[in-house]
Amino acid sequence: LQLNRPDVLYDVPKMLFSSSGPLALKWNYIPKMLPWILRYLNNCNKKSMLHTAKYMHQILNQSMDAYEEIFQEIDTSNLLEQKGIIYVWTNKNLKSRELEIKVRDDLGVKQKILNVKEILDLEPNVKPVFTGGCYYDYAYHARDPKGIVKKIFELFIKRGGKFIKENVKSLKQSSYNETLIETEKKEYKFEKSVIACGAFSKKLTDQLGENIPLDTERGYHVHFKGMESLIKRPIIFLDRGFGMTPMNQGLRAVGTVELGGL
């Protein structure tokens, strides 16, 4: 579920001042980031959360269908698995979990509530430091994200796509169905364009007059080589804000997020 839940207002201070917390912030970047922070906090309420959840659900539903179509055309052997994902928690934040479960139920998301025994039946190597969980048995996880992207890229080229590597200087929408993109070498015209530059996207969206509250988030992970067989599927510990995923490179542990600009 999206991260603008009402309880985030209470969790953030605790995360920031804990040396083992999942959130880090560069304090000298706060003045520049303050407008984004204020808009984010203003949206940490139930009404905004339900609004975001509704439209994220619509996008994610369509994206999975689109991926399924692509996966039928590429070889994802040893790159992708469909073994589901498990979220676990303790009674400490049970109200937040109950709200998330209800929101997903209302949106028609298929989910199965598990007790400790049922979780251990699925993942016997996990220490039972939790009191319950939720299982989404239809979920995919990537064992090699780079390998999957490479396969999709190769399919794109095979279908007649062109890959041009140039630095974009500016872009503007000349009409409803035409975008002008100027690079360091020439100018291009496209009927449809997608801005997918990660943290650098805002420089381009600003040129289109779109006031998008976008800032930078860095994520960090650690790989434990040779331990990927300890679990069969991703497990997310919601109370601590971290997760583990079995991958080809090893068991990946993720959870630390840094907000600090480019």
Feature roles, as predicted:
Residues 1-42, 170-178, 187-262:
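Active-site substrate-recognition segment that forms the wall
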Residues 1-116:
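Dinucleotide-binding Rossmann-like beta1-alpha1 core, especially the glycine-rich loop
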Residues 86-90, 105, 136-139, 258-261:
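Short beta-strand and adjoining strand-loop segment in the mid-core
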Residues 95-107, 119, 126-192:
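Helical element adjacent to the flavin cofactor pocket in flavoenzyme catalytic cores
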Residues 110-112, 162, 211:
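Conserved beta-strand segments of alpha/beta enzyme cores
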Residues 114-119, 166, 247, 256:
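Conserved beta-strand termini and adjacent loop/short-helix elements that scaffold enzyme active sites
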Residues 121-125, 240-243:
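Short beta-strand/turn micro-motifs at beta-sheet edges
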